[in-house]
Amino acid sequence: MLTDREVISTLDMLRNEHLDVRTVTLGISLFDCASDNFDRFATRVQDKISRYAEHLVATCDEVGEKYGIPVVNKRISISPMAVVGAPFGPDDMVRAAQVLDKAACNAGVDFLGGFTALVEKGMTKGDRALIDALPEALATTGRVCSSVNVGSSRSGINMDAVALMGDTIVQIAGRTADRDGIGCAKLVVFTNIPQDVPFMAGAYLGTGEPDVVINVGVSGPGVVKKAIDRAMQSGDRSLGDIAEVIKRTAFKVTRVGEIIGREVAERLGVPFGVADLSLAPAPQVGDSVGEIFQSVGLASIGVPGSTAVLAMLNDAVKKGGAFASSHVGGLSGAFIPVSEDLNIAEAAATGRLTLEKLEAMTSVCSVGLDMVAIPGDTPAATIAAIIADEMAIGMINNKTTAVRIIPVPGKKAGDTVSFGGLLGESAIMPVPGSGGSEKFIRLGGRMPAPIHSLKN
């Protein structure tokens, strides 16, 4: 039985605290669309996506209106294109991306993820073709997102793939230089990538997933901040008390997301997959993960104590969300994307949040270095080395880590770049020691998996 206070609290979340469902993502398997004839493949892909996604946007809007809770983004994820399009070379992979972009546009969704390669132990012909196609594919499409998994705790890190991704990111930035390298904002490099992520740009549908499935990503950093503020005003509070407040709030936010996701799935006649518990910020006041750090007594995100606060936040979100849903998946934690969070972007601009501190914080957060803008002249080997560092954190700690980094052509440290929309804007962050990693990266090979990978 809900108390009057809980009902009023939920209404406040909707009216004043930016509570929303950040994304409902429809996963569609394309394995049955595979063909060595490109035209046949393209027709099958368009037909299947159209068949299942035709009513996705309208259904999300109807369900959101019914409950008074907006579904901000409607998205599609597909099977890894490097596998589905294994017979194709780079040119046909570019064409495949354009087919997917058209299908996403026809369905009315914001983004389509799954232009993906899984290369943690090595690269097939299809994997290499997809990666080689990325600069042109991401430059000539608007809604296609890509991810490349280069490591895992069981397999180690494919350093040849890491080096290749450093080169590829530089090429993508150059190919989209007229748009401040925005193509790089649609590419994520992972270690331990989950198979059911609803958030972009890392979403794809894994090989063990259903033919079609709904996954939902909740939001709510503003809700968490307001709950902490109320708790701090009511008397002396310890960090244990604050963690309890976060946990209870995450429960409410997750339950809302699951209700929306399950009803959308039921109306579309497809199974419900998972709720991703991640606190996903937006570039507006009151919807910031960074503001939570100030609510618990820090001057800003990035100052000493930030990693500890993030660890507590991440853990409390998982505990509360797991109690609210029997099917939790995806990334599930707290995102700290620099340009997508006004408060974090401000901390980066003032120098309180550095690249090194950001990397330290990724060891305890949901993902990794996210939406980080760096100088356009940063060498490819340095970018690869940044990726390698982040992948090592994920491999050793048996967690998902990722890098979405944007070398902005023509910009230097301290300049400002605006990507627009949910991608926000940010100062260009300096890269200490840039140019000092060339020999290390060119060694290549596979970095062995840690000893704790031997679990059988």
From Swiss-Prot:
Gene3D superfamilies for the chain: 3.20.70.20
Source species, domain of life: Bacteria
Listed Pfam families: DUF711 (PF05167)
Assembly description: Homodimer.
Family listed: Belongs to the UPF0210 family.
Stated name of the protein: UPF0210 protein Dde_3704
Taxonomic classification: Bacteria, Pseudomonadati, Thermodesulfobacteriota, Desulfovibrionia, Desulfovibrionales
